[in-house]
């Protein structure tokens, strides 16, 4: 199975797999059962911003979700990613819909990772930034139902021609280049990711959510990972 670390924006509570009974953001380490969660006052139809950060000195993974003009939600978890992830990974965004549905639209996405070793010259870094997405993106690996639209947005799950979200959809987008996320001799390994998103839904209860995830380089959508499993995990263990 894939090795996954993720930050989830979970719009639909699945209490049977340990979700709190409200929309929440969470940190997932190798399982959909989040290690840490915080209540998320999701605002459908409004653009939100997610900022995720980690560094190997503090060994803390943190995420902040905010909408302009309202307070932000923060979640963090202490973890040494050297012990969890392979040295080389890919980073991506995933989303699903199920019986209930929502648009899982990504408007922008940026990422920076840095590895500093003791030698002065040796800093390994990777940076990318999408302010809009091209129609036939060469620098993204699109999986499942994910596609880029004519407005320059990345739609992670299916929408109709008129823009209505479709149910039972799963999609992911990964940056094409592998990321060197840690190294034994590194003094500091760190990364920052930011994305803006828009969730809209005709349903009273939108579902299921969006994630930022880090995985082994050959990661693919696991069979049966739709709905509550957010396109990341084959089961709810």
UniProtKB/Swiss-Prot annotation:
Q: Which domain of life is it from?
A: Eukaryota
Classification via PROSITE patterns? LECTIN_LEGUME_ALPHA, LECTIN_LEGUME_BETA
According to its UniProt entry, the function of this protein is described as: D-mannose/D-glucose-binding lectin with hemagglutinating activity towards rabbit and human erythrocytes. In rats, elicits an acute inflammatory response by inducing neutrophil migration and induces dose-dependent paw edema.
Q: What is its main location?
A: other
* Biological source species: Macropsychanthus wilsonii
| Further remarks about this protein from its record | Binds one manganese (or another transition metal) ion and one calcium ion. The metal ions are essential for the saccharide-binding and cell-agglutinating activities.
Q: Which family does it belong to?
A: Belongs to the leguminous lectin family.
Range of residues in the leader sequence: none
Ligand binding (Mn(2+)): 8, 10, 19, 24
**Pfam families with a match to the protein in the record:** Lectin_legB (PF00139)
> Activity versus temperature?
Hemagglutinating activity stable up to 60 degrees Celsius but diminishes with higher temperatures and is absent at 100 degrees Celsius.
PTM statement from Swiss-Prot or TrEMBL? The beta and gamma chains are produced by partial proteolytic processing of the lectin alpha chain by an asparaginyl endopeptidase.
Q: Which protein is depicted?
A: Lectin alpha chain
